[in-house]
């Protein structure tokens, strides 16, 4: 089953077609990760799934109906989005930004309630930013800010959560913390997550469903253990590699071919061959130059 899907969509920016006749279905209750080389269309696909980009042709479906047919507030109650570059308003505190996640649930007949306050507090606690509630967002580190944005998305209480490169600009420690948090949301809260990631090894470790794209089309999709092979990596990324089991998780681990080592080995072999040829030539020259000995008796 799939609550969110794209059917034969054509996606374009500024008149340039990025993807054509593209179809994907996000499995319910999955942590789906979209991977592929730069400019392959993965972020474009995510924007279409989130209703940020209207397809030129085809349809994005939410619960069986075209996503564009729903009022924006209804979509915001069902689908949360963490864009690639989020900028907080000047002078806003962590608690105030997270509280904005409750806006889709407000209206003329429903104002801020104790339930909203409880959800905001729970969202900050779940992302580890409760102690930062009174801090200004622009004073925080990159990892802390990313957690705050995720807390705001959590406060929407949507069953679907889309994240566009949530680990961009973070160091390795904060990357793992954010991905661990996403895994917890999927495993413990039953949310369906869709994320765009650049790191294939991170994707293979955390995803339950992987979509590999190249040139605006889906090359392969399925469980990482079923589809991540050396052949797929070379086909999608143009990278020669070996795929082994991750010693920590047993998931596929991509080990790039040692190109520098191979180049050094080739260089050493060529140097040895050149020295051998030079040595042979020197020996021949010396023999030719050696004066003849006395005539034999």
Please give the residue ranges for each predicted region:
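Conserved structural motif at the start of ABC-family nucleotide-binding domains
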Residues: 4, 18-21
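Conserved ABC ATPase "signature" region
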Residues: 99, 114-132
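Conserved ABC ATPase signature
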Residues: 111, 136-140, 144
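Catalytic Walker B motif of ABC-type/P-loop ATPase nucleotide-binding domains
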Residues: 161-165
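ABC ATPase nucleotide-binding domains
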Residues: 237-297
């Amino acid at each position: 089953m799939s609550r969110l899907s794209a059917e034969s969509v054509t996606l374009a920016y500024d008149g340039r077609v990025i993807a054509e006749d593209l179809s994907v279905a996000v499995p319910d209750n999955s942590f789906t990760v979209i991977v592929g080389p730069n400019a392959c269309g993965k972020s474009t696909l995510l924007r279409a799934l989130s209703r940020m980009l209207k397809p030129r042709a085809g349809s994005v479906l939410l619960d069986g109906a075209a996503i564009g047919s729903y009022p924006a507030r209804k979509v915001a109650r069902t689908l949360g989005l963490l864009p690639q570059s989020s900028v907080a308003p000047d002078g806003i505190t962590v608690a105030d930004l997270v509280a904005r996640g409750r806006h889709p649930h407000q209206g003329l007949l429903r104002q801020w309630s104790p339930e909203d306050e409880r959800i905001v507090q729970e969202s900050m606690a779940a992302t580890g930013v409760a102690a930062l509630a009174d801090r200004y967002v622009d004073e925080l580190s990159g990892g802390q800010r990313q957690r705050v944005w995720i807390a705001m998305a959590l406060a929407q209480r949507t069953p679907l959560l889309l994240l566009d490169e949530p680990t961009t600009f973070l160091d390795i420690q904060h990357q793992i913390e954010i991905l661990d948090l996403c895994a917890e949301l999927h495993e413990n809260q039953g949310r369906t997550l869709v994320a765009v990631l650049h790191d294939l090894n991170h994707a293979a470790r955390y995803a339950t469903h992987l979509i590999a794209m190249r040139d605006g089309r889906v090359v392969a999709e399925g469980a990482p253990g079923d589809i991540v092979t050396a052949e797929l990596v070379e086909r999608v990324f143009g990278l020669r590699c070996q795929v082994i089991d991750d010693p920590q998780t047993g998931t596929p681990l991509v080990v790039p071919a040692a190109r520098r080592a191979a180049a050094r080995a080739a260089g050493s072999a060529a140097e040895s061959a050149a020295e051998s040829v030079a040595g042979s030539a020197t020996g021949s020259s010396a023999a030719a130059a050696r004066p003849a000995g006395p005539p034999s008796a």
